[in-house]
Amino acid sequence: TTQKRESAFDFWCRLAFEEGINFWFEEEQLFYSDEHMGMTAGIHLTYNPQADTDISDSTVMTWQYGEYLCVDETIHKDNNFVRPSYPLSHENKIEQGGQHSVFESYGRFQLDDEGRPLTQVRFEQLRNGSKVGQATTNCFALMPGKIFTLSQHPHQPMNDRWQVISVSHHGVQPLADNSGGEGTQLSNSVSFIPGTQEWRPPYRYKPTADGDEVATVVGPPGEEIYVNEYGAVKVHFHWDRRGSADHSASCWVRVAMGWSGNGYGFSAVPRIGTQVLVSYLNGDIDRPIITGCTYDGRNAPPIKFPENKTQTTFRSQTHKGEGFNELRFEDAGGKQEVFLHAQKDMNTRVLHDRTTHVLHDHVEVIENNQQMQVKGARTETIDKDNSETVGQHKKITVGKTLSINVGEVIELRCGASVLRMDNGGHVTINGQEFKFEATGPVQITGKDVDIN
């Protein structure tokens, strides 16, 4: 619970009145009560409109009492982000009520156990004025927190127990030389309600937030990221003079993302030391939510400004280590670029087709090994030249057929040995030594066969 723009007394009163607790003083003692049964009874007053004929100190001279049209139903509704579909709503009403209801859509509770008593107290607060009266007496024992009994009123229902709500005392003591024989006069004005009715101090709405403010994300010593299962973080407000700038500085504060859904969306957790902008739901100072981050003297942007003002970047930082991952866009005229940096591994998963179309050059450098597996067929088309250089060994394994179709000439060369074939049907083998071995017959067929 946050105290804002209110004195310590007003802050205490707001919390007490929210629970329906009233208080009063008797001599040097402070009394609290949340029901009329905790109040002191035993004061007996007599109704006598002829005050001049009564010399006692327990007389009621004037009496007014009325019952008024008032709120007969209260409905309070709220929302718990942990159970967003749960109908977190409570109501209270008198018998046959519902014609004059008060509905508050922001009930200031997150659980049913909080909502039920809060709604009951608010209902009783709104009905404080349903049965109320005023009287003039000369009894100075009356004070808030007291219950008195009236007798000898001509209207019998008035001869009952009544609860004092407020008292204003008046006294006149003439100067001795000018008294004319008049004595000291004492009286008071009393506001009261039926003795069995629960009177609740008026509800005090908490001060609303003035707007957004800046805070710093904090956490336990030695941590860089401190977050709960909902992506919420702890923050230290700059106006906090007493709290430590660690994981005890605040409640868990949720972070608003640019896009969110059930298992999808954008997620980026503000890290410890990040300066964030904090907003408040419905202006409630006890319901902060982080709506953005900002750079400051401790946290510099990932790119240098204004030199790189045309760049848009998304850069992370290695947790408890060096390096980063980055996706960057350069929009300078003639230098447009999309840059992707992976600090370690990069995994791409495409569940259907993938198409890449490069309108100019494509350069790829792999400084270690490459492995490719094609479970179906593979087709490669090169409109012009194809040059392949293998520094050491190359091995081709074909399960069935290997077909090589060349339009003009094919030549295999290994040192001084050459095998050349052209599209005219000429096959030439050059070498220093020829060795033919066969485990079966060898057959040479031709129009002319010359062997030298």
Regions found by a protein language model. Give the residues of each.
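Short boundary/loop segments of OB/S1/cold-shock single-stranded nucleic-acid-binding domains
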Residues: 195-212
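Long, distal/terminal scaffolding or interaction modules
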Residues: 428, 432, 439, 445-447, ...
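Hydrophobic alpha-helical scaffolding
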Residues: 1-5, 62-69, 128, 135-138, ...
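Structural signature for extended repeat/solenoid scaffolds and their inter-repeat hinge/linker regions
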Residues: 25, 31-33, 210-430, 434-437
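Glycine- and acidic
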Residues: 126-133, 150, 197-202, 218, ...
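Extended, domain-scale alpha-helical bundle/helix-rich regions
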Residues: 1-195
